[in-house]
Design a protein with these regions (language model features):
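Bacterial N-terminal signal peptides that target proteins for export
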Residues: 1-9
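Active-site His/Glu-centered metal-binding helix of metallohydrolases
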Residues: 70-78, 297
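Non-catalytic, conformational "gating/processing" segments within enzyme and secreted inhibitor domains
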Residues: 146, 195-231, 439
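An aromatic/glycine/proline-enriched structural segment found at the starts
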Residues: 175, 183, 212-278, 388-389, ...
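M16 family metallopeptidases and their MPP-like homologs
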Residues: 42, 47-73, 87-131, 161-188, ...
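Boundary at the C-terminal end of the N-terminal hydrophobic targeting segment
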Residues: 20-24
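Short, polar/flexible loop-turn hinges at active-site or ligand-entry regions and domain interfaces
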Residues: 80-85, 132-140, 369-370
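Bacterial N-terminal signal peptides
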Residues: 8-18
Length: 471
């Protein structure tokens, strides 16, 4: 599953390179309004476009049992109007300005964004500030939209045996962490959810001190400051709710699950609890090195064409797997995992694939990696992130993601410094340290035959608006 791996790796790896040349690097500026709202601005004058993002530090991690999915439902409801905009009017106005907009919900955050001609920034900031402060809708709008969310769950999760297995596996992996709940929510919680549940969540978390506006592109910092003060500044300050720690206890032994689902092939997923990068780790190059070394390890295994997993497990007539993948969760508000997965080749078993995946880790723990592999990962990582800087949206998204995790403005440069200094010995050491049985959860999809008496369910087309970030 190479394509999936690369998407996930991009989600976990923050921006590593701030510009091709330091002398041309636009300065990123951050300031805080009197009401507590953070504003981050990164000018990039190469084209007359801009990205405007509103980040709210609230996601499924902030939900409580019985209301799973409410952060995502609220994201949908933000498009349902204010006292001055009708349902759906927000997006129509952005489109009329020549822009495009969307939103996403993850475990850690909710984000709303517009990609626009830079001379329309004031119009968009006026719209977004109004939506953030004055979202309102009648119960009938909620009743219609909750059915859209339920259908999203049916089509993307319940219609997919692998998605259902991974959902169950996540619940087995985490015991105390809110990460154990699905972002889209349990169907029983969606069935029981009320309009007031969503309004209460909005009132609790959508406060200026829990949000950041990020603007990148063809803009002047002084003008963005003026617009932020004009449109976001009047929003009343309210306390940010106190978050109680929900620390995941140390795992004391392997966890295993067989999940039966209608499928033509088995699938195996191995998750290992690993350290993550935190804000304190950016104080110097010596902190947080294991998390970065683990990300390098994931890339050595599955970060480029012909990487170790593909060579060892997917090639030849006697291959073990049709597909394999590896990724590392580098950072997040909750605990992170290093995940190995694979689909057995014909005649092979999930147990054989699991053993093969672990054998590749053990081989690196015993013998290390070559300088060529290490250099290839570093060059590819830096080149990939540098190329993405052509997108002002990507720049805004990375700055917002860093803010969600409490990282400094120059986190990208500091992370690049860490990456460049990672050694082969460090990759070998983390391969030997973090992949024991006691920190492992193994989930296996056990294929079940299709019942010929049942008509396969064809999911209706869903709106393309909104997305869930599966980080």
């Amino acid at each position: 599953m190479k394509h999936t791996h690369r998407i996930l790796l991009a989600a976990f790896v923050p921006l590593c390179f701030t510009a091709v040349g330091a002398q041309t690097t636009p300065m990123v500026e951050q300031f805080t309004l009197a009401n507590g709202l953070t504003v981050i601005v990164k000018p990039d004058r190469r084209s007359p476009t801009a990205a405007h993002m509103l980040w709210v530090r609230v996601g499924s991690i902030d939900e409580v049992d019985g209301t799973s999915g409410v952060a995502h439902v609220l994201e949908h409801m933000l498009f349902k109007g204010t006292a001055t905009t009708k349902p759906g009017e927000f997006s129509r106005r952005v489109a009329a300005l020549g822009g495009r907009d969307n939103a996403f919900t993850s475990r850690d955050a909710t984000g709303y964004y517009q990609q626009i001609p830079s001379d329309t920034l004031e119009d968009v900031m006026r719209l977004e500030a109004d939506r953030f402060a004055n979202n309102q809708w009648v119960d009938d709008e909620f009743k219609r939209e909750i059915e859209v969310v339920k259908e999203e769950r049916r089509s993307r999760t319940q219609a997919s045996p692998i998605a259902l297995m991974l959902e169950a596996a996540t619940g087995l992996t985490f015991t105390a962490s809110p990460y154990r709940r699905p972002i889209v929510g349990w169907m029983s919680d969606l069935d029981a959810m009320t309009a007031q549940d969503v309004r209460n969540f909005y009132q609790r978390w959508y406060v200026p001190g829990n949000a950041a506006v990020v603007v990148s592109g063809d803009v002047e910092v002084a003008e963005v400051r003026r617009l932020a003060v004009t449109y976001y500044g009047p929003i009343a300050a309210r306390p940010v709710p106190v978050r109680k720690p929900q620390d995941e206890p140390v795992q004391a032994g392997p966890r295993r699950m067989d999940f039966k689902g209608v499928a033509s092939q088995a699938y195996v997923n191995l998750a290992f609890k690993v350290p993550k990068l935190q804000a304190a780790d950016f104080a110097g190059d010596e902190q947080g090195r294991d998390a970065v070394a683990l990300t390098v390890l994931a890339s050595v295994l599955d970060g480029f064409s012909g990487a170790r997993l593909a060579r060892a497990l997917e090639q030849g007539d006697s291959r073990l797997a049709d597909r394999t993948s590896a990724y590392n969760g580098l950072m997040g508000r909750g605990p992170q995992l290093f995940v190995l997965s694979g689909v057995p080749a014909p005649g092979k078993t999930a147990a054989q694939v699991a053993a093969g995946l672990r054998q590749q880790i053990a081989l690196i723990a015993q013998e290390g990696i070559s300088d060529e592999e290490l250099n290839r990962v570093k060059v590819q990582w830096v080149a990939s992130e540098t190329y993405k800087l052509d997108s002002v949206f990507y720049q805004a998204r990375q700055l917002g993601s860093n803010w969600i995790n409490g990282l400094p403005l120059d986190a990208d440069t500091r992370l690049l410094s860490k990456l460049r200094s990672i050694t082969s010995a460090e990759v070998q050491r983390v391969a030997a340290k973090y992949f024991g049985d006691d920190q492992m959860t193994v989930a296996t999809l056990v294929p079940q035959p299709i019942d010929p008496k049942l008509t396969p369910r064809v999911a209706p087309a869903l709106p393309t608006r909104h997305s869930i970030d599966h980080d």
